[in-house]
Amino acid sequence: MVLCWLLLLVMALPPGTTGVKDCVFCELTDSMQCPGTYMHCGDDEDCFTGHGVAPGTGPVINKGCLRATSCGLEEPVSYRGVTYSLTTNCCTGRLCNRAPSSQTVGATTSLALGLGMLLPPRLL
């Protein structure tokens, strides 16, 4: 029973608690579909997602690793002859900059239901 509780506790830990620095990498693109590839970050880097905007155009996005001191900054980037204002949003944890998926939501729901089944029923 104790082993079961320990396993559930480990599964319930947020992804950022494992200390692994793997992130999704995606070149600057005007497509919101950024499947990307996996990359390993340095010890002083965090995962990031960059969102760029320019007047009269659609947004651009990129993902990867970034020095933690550069997180949250806004910088100009050029894409297809247009200069965008790119703002980076950083996160910590393994692959934290990937797009949320229905599998993540389903896993959280399954974990909650599993915990509920392990608890003894209350007597009224």
Swiss-Prot record:
The lineage of its organism: Eukaryota, Metazoa, Chordata, Craniata, Vertebrata. Testis specific. Expressed in spermatozoa. Residues 23-97 form the UPAR/Ly6 domain. GO terms for cellular component: extracellular region; inner acrosomal membrane; membrane; outer acrosomal membrane; plasma membrane; side of membrane. The keyword Signal applies. It holds the Pfam family UPAR_LY6. InterPro entries: LY6_UPA_recep-like, Snake_toxin-like_sf, SPACA4/Bouncer. Residues 98-124 form a propeptide. The gene is SPACA4. Disulfide bonds join C23-C47, C26-C34, C41-C65, C71-C90, C91-C96. GO terms for biological process: binding of sperm to zona pellucida; cell adhesion; fertilization; sperm-egg recognition. Sperm surface membrane protein that is essential for effective sperm-zona pellucida binding and penetration during fertilization. The keyword Cell membrane applies. This is Sperm acrosome membrane-associated protein 4. A lipid is attached at N97 (GPI-anchor amidated asparagine).
